[in-house]
Amino acid sequence: DEGKNNYLMSVVCMSDRYGISAADITTGDCYVTEVDKERKLLDEINKFSPAEIICNDAFFMSGIDMEDLRHRLHISVSALDSWYFGDEMCHQTLQEHFKVSSLEGLGLKDYEIGIIAAGAMFRYLLETQKNALVHMNKVTPYTTEKYMVIDSSSRRNLELVETLREKQK
């Protein structure tokens, strides 16, 4: 859809927490967060409405309804090989991409699982995109507690994303 963000989301399930990174490679927008409940994860998925989710195997085994994501929300979901989610590799991928010696300056100090999600996503993008990712020059960490969550039904009824009749923005 022209004029609509086209997000790729990376989800990592680890230690009963979820690391989330979402990026739109056309605009360069990139976000990182962590949540501790399935409901909050689903809220984030609904908020970004990604075209694709890449994830680790633990996410597939976490009990999330993959068929619901695939069919009702029309999201492609695929698990990547475990090496994508290696802690050291993810840190290194982000440090090289953003040309920093530490991720602290990017505001990611308190987002260990989010760093893994973002690192795996950037590694995946580097391997699958024909173009350089130079326009993706910042990452925005955020906490869900600082924002009011509007569920998908309310978002649709309030026509925040598109109109109900014409499906226009």
Language-model segments: what does each one mean?
Residues 1-169:
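Charged catalytic and DNA/RNA-contacting regions of genome-maintenance
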